[in-house]
Design a protein with these regions (language model features):
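Compact integral membrane and secretory-pathway proteins
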Residues: 1-153
């Protein structure tokens, strides 16, 4: 892998995925109770799903010809990983508004920016012919072909 010759879409997705991966181990929430303070990383609860989304987007950025944009199937997978991670981060942010908003830490905000970065990089730098419906159809076709191939003796 040569980072210099890597396609811009793949490069930005990979950078955002690595930033999100690192953010998962940084403090997300700082809890203070009777003078005792503790912090919690993102590797709890729904944060684990966000972690897998970052890994999935990073792996997809490495697959295939790295000098070209992602093909429809991989583009749709990267888009879905970014969208799912973004939705979970927004949900966690809304949930935190109930009381602990001031205690959110750098890891939470970095993970939110990284998930939005994956989503925006995948969508903004896509091929002009790529669409969400086309990506979903391509993914469905690939799954059907793999299923048919595994059923034949």
């Amino acid at each position: 892998m040569n980072f210099q010759t890597m396609n811009k879409q793949r490069k930005f997705i990979l950078i955002a995925a690595v930033a999100g991966f690192i953010a998962m181990f940084l403090p997300w929430v700082r809890i203070s109770f009777f003078g005792i303070s503790n912090s919690v990383s993102g590797m709890h609860g729904s944060g684990i799903l966000v972690f897998f989304c970052f890994i999935g987007a990073g792996v997809v950025a490495f697959l295939g010809d790295q000098t070209k944009n992602l093909d429809k199937t991989f583009w749709f997978i990267a888009l879905a990983c970014g969208a799912l991670a973004s939705l979970i981060m927004v949900w966690n942010f809304i949930d935190a508004m109930g009381g602990a908003l001031s205690y959110l830490s750098i890891g939470f905000y970095l993970a939110g920016l990284a998930s939005a970065g994956i989503l925006l990089s995948a969508y903004m730098f896509r091929n002009p012919t790529d669409s969400i419906k086309g990506g979903f159809d391509s993914l469905k076709k690939d799954i059907e072909e793999k299923a048919k191939g595994s059923n034949t003796p």
